[in-house]
Regions:
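Hydrophobic/aromatic-rich, well-ordered segments within soluble, folded domains that form packed cores
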Residues: 105-126, 267-291, 677-679
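Extracellular/luminal recognition modules and glycoprotein regions
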Residues: 83-143
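Arg/Lys-rich, intrinsically disordered low-complexity tails that mediate electrostatic binding
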Residues: 1-16, 20-42, 49, 78-79
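Active-site rim elements
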Residues: 100-105, 261-276, 459-460, 650-668
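Short, solvent-exposed loop/turn elements at domain surfaces
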Residues: 124-129, 255-258, 586
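Extracellular mucin-like PTS segments
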Residues: 46-54, 59, 65, 71
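Intrinsically disordered, low-complexity linker/terminal regions across diverse proteins
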Residues: 92, 317, 321, 332-361, ...
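Noncatalytic, helix-rich "gating/capping" subdomain that lines the substrate-entry/channel surface
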Residues: 149-469, 505, 523-524, 532
């Protein structure tokens, strides 16, 4: 027996389940005792044969589904017969194709060894011209395409439900929310703007005896606008006791994501200066258009009283205090008492909390940055009621309110999406209401999506593969050589307690039904936001519940909605969530594809999320999801060396294409890519060894895996969006997400004869773990 095979069998001796469970040697298993201490891990061990399909996967219910798949062959044959190439000429057609491919392989030998991603996706990139059919998302890939499809499905379910239940209270409420966001509502918006202006005028009136806490509490009571507050309040899980909610205070988010644009730097190149001037010019155009929208501000339709420069100046002031120098700690987690906030930071927490609506004042608060908090409070107390800041308060409201009127949102799109992000077109009117519907009717949308799309076979398969890969990752960490014993022990403990959620959360709250209006979207959102805010206030210090979250800056679903096409590792709960919407082709395909394909798609996603347990951020949290420093000093230093090498690799690969970017921004994603790709390669490698395939089959199957990995990463980005994506996207460009991890795999380099000096060569073959 070859040494390689012996080593494999030693690593996976525990997988010989029959011998283990049917003998009296169970007590003698020492290194693998973990399999019997935890029922979840025990189940993993029982199923972890490292094969695609097992008896456990195809239970009685699933056998029926699988048999139904067989009947679809007839339908596919009908399509096959109608294919544009006559049946009697198809062999010759394929012969010609193969000859051409062989010629291309010789011609493109340099491309294979220098840019594997482009070699595999060359044909696709030539055929797909994204400018011909512009999309509202700048990255055209499987994730966005399928998410768009899901949005249209949800809208169809909504319309079908309304049609079927015309007179029900829920159907009427859903219909009103949807219609309000697809129809023009300028008159209603003008009324809301007047109310906002009246509130701000009253706040600035010395006779009303109001102060900065009236403004801050009002803004923070509305989550749609609170992200723009100079001091943002949120109720979130306590990072050091994640089973309980606690109040958090964080600092401002500015309008423009690239904060350097606000700063005049003498060392800027001419190109940089032109770009900064271009952005500032269009930002001012946007602001003038925004203030000109509403009659209470611009009654004569010609001039308004607000100066865009005021907003620029205020945001520059906020940027300055966010980076102010102080001897105080800049840790992201700072637990302070209400008394400390008031005495040391001059922030009247008691008054602020009372005006937020708290009946019992929270005693402790988590602050993201103490230095920035102190400087921000000093600034806003001095200037909050100046004319410049009054303009800023109005802007915070109007920026978000305008996005809920079907006509007005085009102005927001023209600057924030088109100029800043390079988006060619806005989100279609028909699916734009999804964010509002998700806020108001998340449970309804979840139930509808599950009813129409749940595929138990895919759920079972994904759970099975999750457990297999989790077990394999456990063994990989177990044999790690650079972690100190105490760090390794904590890492293994974290994997043992990792929770896997596939499909949708087990418990979700009922949707409240309000008297929504069909022509007033802002009113509708305020109804739900006010209700939700009161719910949050009642949760201070209490156990967590499932609350669907929305990123209101980007109108993006960020919670555990089952209709999100993505997967997540959540460090504060030490869990991986794979929504139901992700369990569909091309991400998983058990009808027509084999192990290599599914490993490269759903398998790679799972392995990637598993690796986030220990990335630059996930490594700060322990097995319970609590913020906890469980690393030794030596391990931290060693890990930083590895991170530095990863950053260097991604920047080096990009420079070859003339692209310069800061790879540190997305290093956590890069670490997860490198570790995840290595994990699924090891999974397939072990399957091939255990199945005793001959070497030529092993090589062929591994090649298929690498090809599919490149295919799953295929993506095109609109030219105008590349610059912004390099600055704000935590994920590097897909080309480097494929090529960089592959270049670290010894098997990949051996199979494709990659040598030092080739573009696909990297001197470091570490998979991090």
């Amino acid at each position: 027996m070859k040494k390689y095979t012996k080593k494999i069998k030693q690593w996976h001796k525990v997988l010989d389940i029959n011998n283990v469970y049917n003998s009296n040697k169970r007590k003698n298993i020492t290194k693998k005792k973990v399999c019997y201490k935890n029922t979840n891990i025990s189940r993993i061990c029982e199923s972890a044969k490292y094969t695609t399909y097992t008896d456990q996967l195809y239970n009685k219910d699933n056998v029926v589904i699988v048999n139904n798949y067989v009947s679809q062959i007839d339908n596919k044959f009908k399509k096959y017969r109608k294919y544009k190439i006559p049946m009697d000429k198809r062999t010759h057609y394929m012969v010609d194709k193969i000859k051409n491919m062989n010629a291309l392989d010789t011609k493109h030998k340099n491309l294979i060894i220098n840019d594997f991603y482009n070699y595999v996706n060359l044909q696709w990139m030539k055929e797909i011209v994204i400018e011909d059919e512009p999309k509202y998302y700048v990255e055209v890939d499987n994730f966005r395409i399928i998410q768009e499809k899901v949005f249209y499905q949800l809208v169809k379910y909504v319309k079908d439900y309304i049609k079927k239940h015309k007179t029900s209270k829920k159907a009427i409420a859903i219909k009103n929310v949807y219609n309000s966001m697809v129809t023009e509502s300028t008159t209603k918006m003008n009324n809301h703007v007047k109310q906002i202006l009246d509130f701000i005028d009253d706040t600035f009136n010395v006779k009303t005896k109001t102060n900065i806490y009236d403004v801050l509490s009002a803004i923070n009571s509305n989550e749609i606008i609170s992200w723009g507050s100079p001091i943002q309040w949120q109720l979130l899980p306590d990072e050091k006791n994640v089973t309980k909610y606690i109040s958090h205070l964080s600092m401002a988010k500015l309008s423009i994501y690239d904060y350097l644009i606000y700063i005049d730097d003498p060392s800027d190149t001419l190109e940089t200066k032109k770009y900064k001037a271009y952005v500032k010019k269009h930002f001012f155009i946007y602001l003038n258009h925004l203030f000109a929208l509403y009659e209470p501000i611009n009654s004569d339709k010609k001039n308004h009283k607000y100066n865009p420069q005021d907003i620029w100046d205020v945001e520059l002031e906020l940027l300055t205090v966010m980076g102010c120098n102080s001897n105080m700690t800049n840790n992201i987690y700072n637990s302070v008492s209400a008394h400390e906030l008031e005495r040391e930071y001059n922030f009247n927490w008691t008054e602020f909390a009372q005006k937020l609506g708290y009946k019992e004042i929270p005693k402790r608060i988590i602050v993201s940055n103490l230095s920035a908090l102190k400087c921000t409070i000093k600034l806003i107390k001095e200037k909050w009621n100046t004319p410049k800041w009054k303009t800023y308060w109005v802007y915070i409201y109007l920026r978000q309110l305008s996005r809920f009127n079907n006509k007005d949102r085009k102005i927001y799109f023209n600057f924030f999406k088109k100029i800043l992000h390079g988006s060619p077109v806005d989100m279609p009117d028909e699916i734009y209401p999804i964010t509002g519907l998700s806020l108001c009717f998340n449970t309804f949308l979840t139930e509808q999506y599950k009813e129409n799309n749940n595929n138990q076979l895919y759920v079972d398969y994904t759970e099975h593969l999750c457990n297999d890969l989790l077990t394999l990752f456990y063994y990989k960490i177990h044999r790690n050589t650079w972690l100190d014993p105490s760090t390794k022990k904590a890492a293994l403990k974290k994997l043992l307690k990792l929770k896997l959620i596939v499909g949708s959360p087990e418990k979700i709250r009922e949707d409240p039904i309000f008297d929504y209006k069909s022509d007033d979207p802002w009113y509708n959102m305020l109804l739900l936001i006010d209700w939700k805010h009161k719910q949050y206030l009642s949760l201070e210090g209490k156990d967590l519940i499932d609350i669907p979250r929305i990123d209101w800056e980007h109108f993006k679903l960020t919670g555990t909605q089952s209709y999100i096409v993505n997967a997540f590792y959540m460090p504060t709960s030490n869990s991986i969530y794979i929504p139901l919407a992700y369990l569909q082709p091309p991400f998983i395909d058990l009808k027509e594809r084999g192990l290599e394909y599914n490993l490269a798609f759903i398998g790679y996603t799972i392995a990637h999320e598993l690796s986030h347990c220990f990335d630059a951020n996930g490594s700060k949290f322990d097995e319970n999801g609590n913020l906890n420093d469980w690393w030794t000093k030596n391990d931290k230093l060693e890990y930083q060396k590895k991170i530095k090498d990863v950053i260097n690799q991604y920047e080096t690969f990009a420079k070859r294409d003339g692209i310069e970017f800061d790879a540190a921004i997305g290093v956590s994603e890069s670490l997860a890519d490198i570790s995840g790709m290595s994990l699924i390669e090891e999974y397939l490698r072990d399957v091939l060894v255990i199945d005793r395939d001959i070497d030529i089959i092993r090589r062929t199957n591994l090649k298929k895996l690498y090809y599919y990995l490149a295919i799953q990463g295929k993506q095109k980005i609109y030219k105008n969006a590349i610059k912004s994506q390099l600055k704000i996207n935590p994920h590097p460009l897909e080309k480097y997400r494929v090529n960089c991890p592959l270049s670290r795999l010894p098997l990949f380099k051996a199979i494709f004869d990659i040598k030092k000096g080739d573009g696909m060569w990297w001197n470091n073959e570490e998979s991090i773990w």
